[in-house]
Amino acid sequence: MGGDFSKSGREQAMYHYAVSDVLPVLLHLQDEFRQSAFSPYCTELQITPGNPDFPPICLKTRDGHTVRLIGKIDRVDICRDGAQKWVRVVDYKTGEKVFSLGHLLYGLDMQMLIYLFSILSEGTALSDAQPAGVLYLPAGKVKSDQKRGASKTPEKKRNETYQMNGVLLRDAHLLTLMEQNGEGIYVPGKLDAKGELDTKKGTFLTQEQMRNLRKYVLEQLVDMAERVYHGEIDALPLELPKEDPCKFCAFSNICGNSELCRQRIPYGDSRMQEKKMMEILEELAEEENN
């Protein structure tokens, strides 16, 4: 895209449109990293058989099939805190994305967790690190819904637009490593007046829950693989509020369910789903202890 030679008017307009969208994101990232103990370890990190530092996790189904978990991570951040090494993965989203622990019941919102657990597995370059969390960073246009008479600064509007969401380790000190003052400007969590983690302002898991979540996610992947190998690939999307599962599907005209006459109905509301997921993690902890 260098220079203006041979560019059409449309190409130039698209280029300037992209640049105008990127600049606010870069300014926000600059502000965040200026005050954070975390820094980028790698961008576009490949988890493939050809990468000796980060080979894929290999899982075995009960009937002998092998499943390899490959992919690419937008960004991996690292923080060295004394003898401890923390790692978090960040995914850039041009659209709206809100992580829900309850979605894991249905195999959703697992991709970034799979990546996190993969790069921390035995035999990788980060096997000596601990998981700090998974974060989704909105990377679209700055919100322009400010009401008449409002006095928000451009910086505040930018921070509101690009505040990350996701799941973090339940650790107040770790939160201050991500965000020095713990105000919840950049990450989905904040400290209360006593300097303790405000668990109502985000999704947090203990180290034990994070370990059991890894076990749950990998078990779900094996179960999915077994169902696919056995031919269970029905066009039966999950019914979710404000989401059309067929919106970007290239096969909606041949699946036989393009009108969504058949859908999976989720268990209760989002709060009930999250509660159910936490109960599953508790059950896995009891199994491990017994």
Residue positions per predicted region:
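Structural signature of nuclease core domains in nucleic-acid processing machines
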Residues: 1-290
